Regions:
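Short beta-strand
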Residues: 6-10, 150, 171, 180-181
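A short, glycine/Asx- and small/polar-enriched loop/turn
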Residues: 22-25, 51-66, 108-115
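Helical element adjacent to the flavin cofactor pocket in flavoenzyme catalytic cores
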Residues: 69-128
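Active-site lid/adjacent beta-loop-alpha segment flanking the redox-cofactor pocket in flavoenzymes
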Residues: 162-217
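Conserved hydrophobic/aromatic beta-strand scaffold that supports enzyme active sites
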Residues: 16, 116, 157-159, 179
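A general structural signal for well-ordered alpha-helical segments in protein cores
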Residues: 1, 24-27, 46, 83-84, ...
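Central helical "cap/lid" subdomain
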Residues: 119-168
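Dinucleotide-binding Rossmann-like beta1-alpha1 core, especially the glycine-rich loop
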Residues: 1-55, 198
């Protein structure tokens, strides 16, 4: 509502699974903390997890048995592109000039003062520069002679071909480092934690895809 844009937010609920006693303790602690802060989180037993999301295998003789889980029913997903578009339009309405496909190549300085930035579309004169480039923030800061205490790691996700509706919530598991939900078009949206290595790469790798699929199965 604040940005006056449909970000396609779907309040389908988010469920975190517990696979061992430490998971159970941690998730119950999180549930209590949420409720103390007015958030309507609940802890589910194994049977309640199965009832809420029937596709989950709750057999107790598998490698990572489900011992329970937390559920926040008002949580959900938003279309990431729509969120970016909404913020962009809101910024535009506030007078921000957004230049697309314009890469910063360098920051022109005079001593400790910034005079402007060199881009693929020419020089932009300015005395102030804001760095909001996520994982590449340290690269831009280095152009100004600053070293940020950051480590950038790839975070990969993938989608399947569209399939019939099988899951109407978001399921996450810290033990296997994976999450899965289903888009409106039927694709399974699957992701995991960050890669083990430090990198600025924006390319995917087959071993991560294989490991992520193994995790959700």
């Amino acid at each position: 509502q604040e940005i006056n844009y449909n970000v396609m937010f779907s309040q389908r609920g988010v469920m975190n699974l517990a696979h061992n006693l430490q998971d159970v303790r941690d998730l119950k602690r999180r549930t209590h903390a949420n409720r103390l802060n007015g958030i309507d989180a609940v802890y589910l037993s194994t049977e309640e997890v199965k009832k809420f999301c029937p596709i989950i295998n709750t057999s107790q003789d598998i490698r990572y048995p489900v011992l329970g889980g937390t559920l926040q029913r008002r949580a959900g997903t938003a279309r990431h592109d729509a969120v970016a578009w909404g913020y962009a339009r809101g910024a535009d309405e506030m007078g921000v000039d957004i230049i697309q496909n314009c890469e910063v190549k360098g920051i022109k300085r005079n001593g400790d003062e910034v005079e402007g930035i060199e881009t693929t579309k020419g020089f932009i004169k300015t005395k102030k520069v804001g760095v909001v480039a996520a994982g590449h923030s340290s690269v831009l800061a280095n152009m100004a002679g600053l070293r940020l205490p950051l480590e950038s790691k790839p975070l990969q996700a993938l989608v399947s071909e569209p399939v019939k509706p099988i899951i109407d919530t978001v399921v996450m598991s810290n033990a296997v480092h994976a999450y899965v939900s289903q888009s409106d078009k039927g694709e399974l949206v699957i992701g995991a934690g960050t890669d083990d290595y430090v990198s600025y790469s924006q390319k995917g790798s087959h071993d991560i895809v294989e490991g992520t699929l193994n995790a959700i199965l």
